[in-house]
């Protein structure tokens, strides 16, 4: 029973992180498409959609692998910047 509860908690955590990443990508892409100037300091270019998506996928991969390592009891690594 405890294993089922732990697995459910892991899936909930992974699902929450996936939701957050997708929400971040959606918001960044929409801001880029609409062109809200308040997100970018004067004289800078908005972040390219591909950069936001690539970065979000890297963070998602790190989060999923980190969660797996924590479950298996392996050592932790720093998140990619």
UniProtKB/Swiss-Prot annotation:
Q: Which domain of life is it from?
A: Eukaryota
Q: In which tissues is it expressed?
A: Brain.
| A single cellular component GO annotation | cytoplasm
Q: Does the keyword Signal apply?
A: no
GO BP terms, alphabetized? brain development; establishment of localization in cell; insulin secretion; neuron differentiation; positive regulation of insulin secretion; regulation of protein localization; response to glucose
Q: InterPro entries of this UniProt entry?
A: Neuronatin
Name the UniProt key words of this record, in alphabetical order: Developmental protein
Q: What does this protein do?
A: May participate in the maintenance of segment identity in the hindbrain and pituitary development, and maturation or maintenance of the overall structure of the nervous system.
Which family, according to the similarity comment? Answer: Belongs to the neuronatin family.
Q: What is this protein called?
A: Neuronatin
Give the organism, scientific name.
Rattus norvegicus
What are the top taxonomic ranks of the organism? Answer: Eukaryota, Metazoa, Chordata, Craniata, Vertebrata
Name of the gene encoding the protein in the UniProt record: Nnat
């Amino acid at each position: 029973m405890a294993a089922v509860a732990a697995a459910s908690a892991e899936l909930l955590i992974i699902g929450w992180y996936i939701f957050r990443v997708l929400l971040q990508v959606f918001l960044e892409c929409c801001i880029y498409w609409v062109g809200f100037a308040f997100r970018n300091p004067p004289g800078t270019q908005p972040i390219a959609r591909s950069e936001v998506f690539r970065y979000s996928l890297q963070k998602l991969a790190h989060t999923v692998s980190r969660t797996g390592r924590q479950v298996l009891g392996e050592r932790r690594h720093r998140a990619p910047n």
